[in-house]
Amino acid sequence: CWDWIKATDTTRPVIFSYPGSAVEKKAEIFDILSMHYQNVYGNVGQWGMATRNFQGHGIPALFDEWAHPACYTYATLQTDPNIREFWGKSLDMMWSGLFNAPGGLGGAIWGYVDETFSLPEPKFGTSFWKEFARTAKPLDYQGNCVGYGEWGIVDVWRRQKPEFWSTKKAYSPVRLLVEDNLSFTTGQELMLTIHNRFDHTNLNEIHATYTYRGVTKSLELQPVAPHTKGMIVIPAEQWENGETLQVEFFTAANELIDVYRFVLGTEKII
């Protein structure tokens, strides 16, 4: 297969899952390092191959399986479901680390859809699939459901789970590098640092709005080249402590890219 690909298309790089198994047989059949389930800092060792800080062996690395939502921590999911929110924080750490790593190509969440199947008790025979499953759950956890579990960002009916939004936030190509609570001076502009994480799109090719006290206004974006940082300016308003400021970014086709909600000063406690 390697020989055919290289003879047919010399421009196409080749990836091979579990590349250490090929190296073990002295087969040089990959240009891209495929690794699975590194930690949030990009470190993992598999079959004699390893990455550190999302890099390894002097070639580009693609983590073609990573970061499925929490589905194996059965007891924790029952007692502390907020682990699902924390999963989004870890995904954000991973993508931000990989984005800045030389040769870091990307990471693919495995998988998109929950894998749970609710099966009735059989009229004849035994429920062999429960014992057969490699990821057998505690009986009080799974009931008559089998499968790897709720490891998707949409459920079995393709409804978006909270993890869907966490994924959009983590992979967002527009990142405001400011704290959730903004310092301000009433009647003066707000200056926000922004990171353009698009690969090809200049920031002035998209558009943005800001909403303050229920009034939404357009926001002019200055040129910021891909993979660079710049500033956006929120025009002066009569800012007040505890009020919220919402900033939204849209594609040229008016599709939502990301939303940020900030508190001016100290949040009001009701």
What name fits each language-model region?
Residues 97-270:
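Carbohydrate-binding surfaces of carbohydrate-active enzymes
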Residues 1-153, 157:
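Substrate-binding/catalytic cleft of secreted carbohydrate-active enzymes
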